[in-house]
Swiss-Prot record:
Residues given in the record as Zn(2+) binding sites: C13, C16, C35, C38
Keywords assigned: ATP-binding, Chaperone, Metal-binding, Nucleotide-binding, Zinc
InterPro entries per record: AAA+_ATPase, ATP-dep_Clp_protease_ClpX, ATPase_AAA_core, Clp_ATPase_C, Clp_protease_ATP-bd_su_ClpX, ClpX_bact, P-loop_NTPase, Znf_CppX_C4
Originating organism: Citrifermentans bemidjiense (strain ATCC BAA-1014 / DSM 16622 / JCM 12645 / Bem) (Geobacter bemidjiensis)
GO annotation, biological process: cell division; proteolysis involved in protein catabolic process
Keyword ATP-binding set for record: yes
Domain ClpX-type ZB: from-to ranges: 1-54
Signal peptide extent: none
Protein name stated in the entry: ATP-dependent Clp protease ATP-binding subunit ClpX
Any Gene Ontology CC annotation: HslUV protease complex
Subunit organization: Component of the ClpX-ClpP complex. Forms a hexameric ring that, in the presence of ATP, binds to fourteen ClpP subunits assembled into a disk-like structure with a central cavity, resembling the structure of eukaryotic proteasomes.
Length: 417
């Protein structure tokens, strides 16, 4: 590179071409010159690269430990202690593997994808969402019942990756370390445990389509979703380090486990059957890969989900705890809304039990709690903003069972509404 302008004795920067009159400082080397502006730019580039290297080196140390992960899960999800431990360990090991620099000859560590088994409303989705929040990674959720294998009417499995990309603002690097939760995974089991000779586009076919992205592949994702066509441009996403959590209720799986362990359910065993049904959650806790094969999953798919965690059905006591104890408990949310109106909201113990019992009748687990509360609270939430001098609102069991109006306490006078 020239160190002088050929037309004069003016010195110029060998990198940007600016003359010594255009810059503050020009530093000479053996055959080149560099200006202060280029030096500053080089410093910025080096500093940025150092930050990235430091971040990679310290991410493993910043990763929450399994006990810390479970403690945060306890703040949002009631019960399910063993499932939380399985999730905490699996997630910790997964991200430890992701952040560790793999050297030639190192032991190859496989992904710790997770299968959650448990009844509707037992907390499967909430656990997955909370994990993503703890780890500050993008989270996407998909419904397995909408998926079909490529070429059939329905949603391509690659669109799951698109949802994760959208959650990470199309930052491919961030998306490649995200979490995907696939709900209703039991719905893609084939209809029998023998291989099908006909096309099963929403069962075994979907399992085959999911295999590669769950294990790890470079997926071609249409930026706007929908079906692929040859003229389209695709985003390339490596799914190797994406953690997949699959969940489902698995109705009938407990019967398969009963048959395997030899529980008597006929004749004189009628009483035994009643006891076993009460402990369906305990049966699911003993699930094996062979049980999942009989349920209708192909061996390769079961092999991609090595971590199994079962969730038990919620009882009345757990439902009451869910209403009032978690950080985002429904009762706390409603009380906050009333606080904004400068009104105290109180729920009696009887009202909480009534809400829990109504939810248990609906057999929708914790999901039913919100709709019961919304229905009970609608009228009072409509009226309170327009009323003055209201000091307190009390919700008792009659509001839930008999649709009676809540008790309203005014600033100076207490009376029933």
């Amino acid at each position: 590179m020239s160190r002088r302008d050929d037309r004069s004795d003016t010195l110029i920067c060998s990198f940007c071409g600016k003359s010594q009159e255009e810059v503050k400082k020009l530093i000479a080397g053996p055959t080149v010159y560099i200006c202060d502006e280029c030096i500053e730019l080089c410093n910025d580039i080096i500093a940025e690269e150092s930050k990235l290297e430091d971040a990679t080196a310290t991410d493993v140390r910043k990763l929450p430990k399994p006990q810390e992960i479970k403690e945060v899960l306890d703040e949002y999800v009631i019960g399910q202690s063993r499932a939380k431990k399985v999730l905490a360990v699996a997630v910790y090991n997964h991200y430890k593997r992701v952040e560790a620099a793999v050297k030639p000859g190192d032991v190859e560590m496989q992904k710790s994808n997770i299968l959650l088994l448990g009844p509707t409303g037992s907390g499967k989705t909430l656990l997955a969402q909370t994990l993503a929040r703890i780890l500050k990674v993008p989270f996407a959720m998909a419904d397995a019942t909408n998926l079909t294998e490529a070429g059939y009417v329905g949603e391509d499995v690659e669109n799951i990756i698109l949802t994760l990309l959208q959650a990470s603002d199309y930052d491919v690097e961030k998306a490649q370390k995200g979490i995907i939760y696939i709900d209703e995974i039991d719905k893609i089991a084939r209809k029998s445990d023998s291989p099908s000779i006909t096309r099963d586009v929403s069962g075994e076919g979907v399992q085959q389509a999911l295999l590669k992205i769950i294990e790890g592949t470079v997926a071609s994702v249409p930026p706007k979703g929908g079906r692929k066509h040859p003229q389209q441009e695709f985003l390339k996403v490596d799914t190797t380090n994406i953690l997949f959590i699959c969940g489902g209720a698995f109705p009938g799986l407990d019967s398969i486990i009963q048959q395997r362990i030899g529980v008597k359910t006929l004749g004189f065993g009628a009483d035994v059957k009643k006891k076993v049904e009460k402990k369906a959650g305990e049966l699911l806790a003993g699930v094996t890969p062979e049980d999942l094969l009989k349920f209708g999953f192909i061996p390769e798919f079961v092999g991609r989900l090595p971590m199994l965690a079962s969730l038990s059905e919620l009882d009345e006591e757990a439902m009451v705890q869910i209403l009032k104890e978690p950080k985002n408990a429904l009762i706390k949310q409603y009380q906050k809304l009333f606080d904004m109106e400068h009104v105290k909201l109180k729920f009696t113990d009887g009202s909480l039990v009534a809400i829990a019992r109504e939810a248990l009748k609906r057999k929708t687990g914790a999901r039913g709690l919100r709709s019961i509360l919304e229905n009970a609270m609608l009228d009072i939430m409509y009226e309170i903003p327009s009323q003055s001098m209201v000091k307190e609102v009390v919700i008792n069991e009659e509001v839930i069972y008999s649709k009676e109006k809540p008790i309203i306490v005014y600033e100076n006078v207490a009376e029933s509404a």
